[in-house]
Amino acid sequence: MTEIITKANTNQYQTGAAAILLACILWGTTGTAASFTQAVSPLATGAFAMGVGGLLQALLAGKIIAYQRRQLWQFRSALLCSALALAVYPLAFYTSMQLAGVAVGTVVSIASAPFFTVLIERLFGKGLSISRRWWQSFATGALGIALLAGAKTPMHAQSGSDYLFGIALGLVAGLAYAIYSWVAKAMIVQGVKSQAAVGAIFALGALLLLPSLALTGENLFANPLNSSIALYMAVFPMCVGYLLFGYGLRHVEVHNANLLTLFEPVVASLLAVWIVGETISLLGWLGIALIGGCLVMQSQQKGAE
């Protein structure tokens, strides 16, 4: 009986991990897609994509949100905090990519999230122990990320101050992402359906983000290219991607989930090479291989540590 339960937990973990990796593929397309917009502020790109994507998620989860409204009300403070973090995330993330480059902005934002997640769990969690295997896989992934970031050639040369500010914004994005995912996981663990938790957070985040388009949304729909990119990013990476991530959080601990998201900068870098025309050196490819090893280690873990 114990073996059956263990096998079931492992299968659930691997299904959740696969959903998170699929979400990473969708998220990894955002930097390349955004690079083709014409005269559009990164603030507008982030606000529209996350805002409209959030509204779509809320509509899809409307019945579940209504059914669990009392449970959600019990988490109102956490919901507000998570929604604020979710609103900050795309603004910091897309601006970071513009200032530091698509690859470096993505790498810093995503690679810092596992660090911040563990810190949050240590400060506010229930003493969840972090396994030696997690630290080993994180060290492998962090080394891979460092090699990839150092070997990548940005699309546009930036001044030193802009570059450093872009990296700082990437760290802000990583912290915001960690807060969102930790709150969502905490709600799911305490009985809130993943669709209700994610849908409610995104609905509140959308209410904070969409009004900013009145100030930043110039040229967002100035031509068919800008319009199609904006709609693609809202529907697929932001809506479908976060639905997949929410599903994955049912079966994967949040510190493991955020470590799996290191797959996103790999996807982003490969797309930048194949589509945008950037180059990756031998060290960069070695970094990608190390990140792959990190992902294999994480995807084979049991559902509970």
Question: Could you describe each region identified by the protein language model?
Answer:
Residues 60-64, 113-136, 266-286:
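C-terminal transmembrane-helix exit sites in multi-pass transporters
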Residues 48, 105-112, 183-206, 238-274:
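Helix-helix packing/entry segments at the starts of transmembrane helices
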Residues 1-53, 84, 88-92, 156-186:
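Glycine-/small-residue-enriched transmembrane alpha-helix faces in small-molecule transporters
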Residues 62-105, 109, 146-147, 234-252:
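Specific transmembrane alpha-helical segments of multi-pass solute transporters/efflux pumps
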Residues 37, 45, 96, 123-126, ...:
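Hydrophobic/aromatic residues within transmembrane alpha-helices
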